A protein has these predicted regions:
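Extracytoplasmic/lumenal domain signature
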Residues: 25-206
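Bacterial N-terminal signal peptides that target proteins for export
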Residues: 2-12
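Intrinsically disordered, low-complexity regions
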Residues: 2-3, 18, 67
Length: 206
């Protein structure tokens, strides 16, 4: 399952290959199903500041809202499928920019508080920070230890530190410069998505 998101006491879950589901958790009867959309989900959901929900699907992107199940728009990526990231207008679905990640497929990005997009391609030993408005590359981080990006999402700490899992190793990167703040060898293959506690503790299963 992809990473769930919690907003305004509502839990949004995108089930891989099945459907997108939002369920109320606090302030309502726990687990109450608000709505569901049937789409071939390929990524974790993301929620804009206006409540728009974005879900990557096999064959394109879908936009809806946290309160309704109505699809605002759908968009199919141009050309052949590959490792690219697309920035689409949240209201119309019009493409703003695209960036070629150079891998077999792109992983779900993380968005910083300043709009910076953090993402890497699956199967490659490289990670990017992109300008959220233009798609221009801010920095890249490479490693040469045989570990490659897997289907694990990057996580951003409260101080802007970006954490990535690369197989056997977790890296903490400066969100502004991409410099390596620290790294930790897990001793085992990472098997879960990174999570950051309110005290800054990093959690990952291996």
């Amino acid at each position: 399952m992809n990473r769930p998101l919690l907003q305004n006491s509502r839990l949004l879950i995108a089930l891989l290959l099945v459907q997108g589901i939002a369920a109320g958790v606090h302030g309502q009867k726990p687990g109450t199903l608000l709505w569901k959309l049937h789409h071939p989900v390929a990524s974790s959901p993301a929620i804009g500041t206006d409540g728009t929900v974005y879900i990557g699907s096999f064959g394109g992107w879908v936009s809806t809202t946290i309160n309704k199940r109505i699809s605002n728009w759908k968009r199919s990526p141009p050309g052949k499928s590959g490792s690219s990231i697309f920035a689409l207008d949240g209201k119309t679905g019009k493409k703003k920019w695209t960036f070629d990640l150079g891998g077999s497929e792109g992983l779900t990005p993380a968005i910083g508080s300043d709009g910076t997009v953090y993402v890497g391609p699956s199967g490659k030993s490289i990670f990017y920070a992109l300008d959220g408005k233009t798609g221009a590359k801010k920095w890249e981080f490479k490693w040469n230890r045989g570990s490659r990006n897997r289907s694990m999402l990057p996580a951003i700490g409260g101080d802007g530190t970006v954490y990535i899992g690369t197989g056997f190793t977790v890296y903490a990167l400066d969100g502004k410069t991409g410099s390596n703040k620290w790294e930790f060898n897990l001793g085992h293959q990472a098997r879960s998505t990174l999570a950051i506690g309110i005290d800054g503790t990093v959690y990952i299963g291996a």
